[in-house]
């Protein structure tokens, strides 16, 4: 390791830089228009939606994504409402082949038969198949901690020793683990105390995940504590804590998580509304959070699309949501949300920060995932 340069060396470097600047002529300060994007720039800026779930042929969806300037990371999930994992994998591989440089995907594994001695080998085979076909990450879902039970009836947590070979492999091979553990804190609150209407709607439609009605199930704190123990045991693991790390109700909590785990990033998928809710009350706090952690936040929408590809209205709604997110981050417009009462303003982030959130952080985390020449 080389020693840090001394004061004299630093002075010489600074003097040389100053001389170069003078020789080139003093550059005029960037205009406000050059430092910020506008709403109209949306379709002209290269972006990555690093959290979608796309099934089937998805030709309409991909046409809209391309028109809107998006590359995508489609994430396979062990979710009963989605197609079987093998079918999800085939759809993701097909998309990647049909849209080279535009689509990347993350694999997952089934927890079916988890209590069986044969489970570990089956999970390994699923992951091997995904990696062989180009997967750039692995997703673990909220069923771990909220649904999966062991042979004795206890809930299986993310730090269970049987996951250790998988996590250790990802850490060793520098493969990203995407983790959705727990749910919004609203999940543990009565309906009348929930902050946003979309959470009320989701938990009415999915009562099996509405933890307020299931006090016998693990608490929000217990699930996240198990996740954090897993991360402490694997300090070199690259971890994408999706959905603002399930700490969406307070950006200070998200900040503390990022400070504790320097190899973790977060995405905003399906949690932008919680940032908007906080911005309606303290916009500068939310803006400061995004500015401070600009290198560790990824844009994601959590769009689920397909396998039906016949409804143009569905694609139009996705475009509208993408555009609304862009408006919130890049403009200072006065806005309203269907999810809560009251107005809020866009955060008007500098374009350098917007580029990181919308593209550069995903490229850095997932390497050459969207390289059209990347081999399987």
Positions of the model-derived regions?
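An N-terminally biased module of ancient metal coordination in phosphate/nucleic-acid-related enzymes
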Residues: 25-102, 122
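Active-site gating/metal-coordination segments in enzymes
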Residues: 34-40, 90-211, 215-216, 265, ...
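N-terminal secretory signal peptides that target proteins for export/translocation
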Residues: 1-7
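Bacterial N-terminal signal peptides
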Residues: 9-21
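A general structural detector for well-ordered alpha-helical segments in enzyme core domains, enriched
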Residues: 61-64, 91-95, 122-130, 162-166, ...
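Hydrophobic faces of well-ordered beta-strands that scaffold small-molecule active sites
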Residues: 48-52, 72-75, 103-107, 138-140, ...
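H/E-rich (His + Asp/Glu) clusters that bind or coordinate divalent metals
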Residues: 215-229, 234-376
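Acidic-and-aromatic substrate-binding clefts and catalytic sites of carbohydrate-active enzymes
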Residues: 51-59, 78-88, 112-121, 148, ...
